Regions:
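Acidic/histidine-rich, metal-coordinating catalytic segments
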Residues: 42, 61-77, 151-156
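Active-site beta-loop-alpha junctions of metal-dependent nucleic acid enzymes
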Residues: 19-20, 36-61, 65
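C-terminal domain-tail junction helix/linker
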Residues: 89-91, 113-168
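RNase H-like two-metal-ion nuclease catalytic core shared by retroviral integrases
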Residues: 68-70, 74, 80-86, 93-116, ...
Length: 168
């Protein structure tokens, strides 16, 4: 599972001094299934919350490893909240090479797609409206949008085919 974080633009009517929200994303390496949430900051606690509440809880399959950049939300001391959450859930951690964000290309690309197809195409009335539209877009991305990297299938179709195979 590839993870990344992006600072979101201010909403219409917000001032430059207002606190910015952050978009957390996770994309499955095999199926390209997307998980995303908007959280109030880019801390280890928010990353841990994203992992447990927005990734592990709704994900129907086992997450063996997460791959992220070396940001402070993902990497730190021995008692780092995100690292502890990974450890407690039996999830390994791997990191990109320092100063090489392109080595986390899947997460970087899905953020670009989200910003182009979701955020830049709409005007949001409120943070709640933006969150609601993010949920709608993630559903569209996973169940309707064909993916070139999946030979025109959706992440849902890839997972459906995988889980309908007989167990050997």
């Amino acid at each position: 599972m590839h993870l990344d974080t992006e600072r979101l633009p201010l909403l219409k009517g917000q001032k430059a001094t207002d606190k910015r929200d952050y978009l957390f994303v996770a994309i499955d390496d095999f199926s390209r299934e997307l998980y995303a949430a908007i959280l109030p900051d880019k801390t280890a606690d928010s990353a841990a919350k994203f992992l447990t509440e927005h990734l592990i809880d709704p994900c129907p399959y086992l997450i063996e490893c997460v791959y992220s950049d070396n940001g402070t939300e993902y990497k730190g001391s021995a008692n780092h909240a995100f690292g502890v959450a990974c450890y407690e859930n039996g999830i390994g951690q791997k990191f990109t090479r320092v100063a090489r964000p392109q080595t986390n290309g899947k997460a970087e690309r899905v953020i670009r797609t989200l910003m182009e197809m979701w955020h830049e195409k709409q005007s949001f009335d409120s943070p709640e409206h933006r969150q609601k539209e993010l949920c709608r877009f993630v559903n569209f991305y996973n169940t309707v949008k064909p993916h070139r990297s999946l030979n025109g299938d959706t992440p849902f179709e890839v997972l459906q085919a995988y889980f309908s195979q007989p167990v050997v």
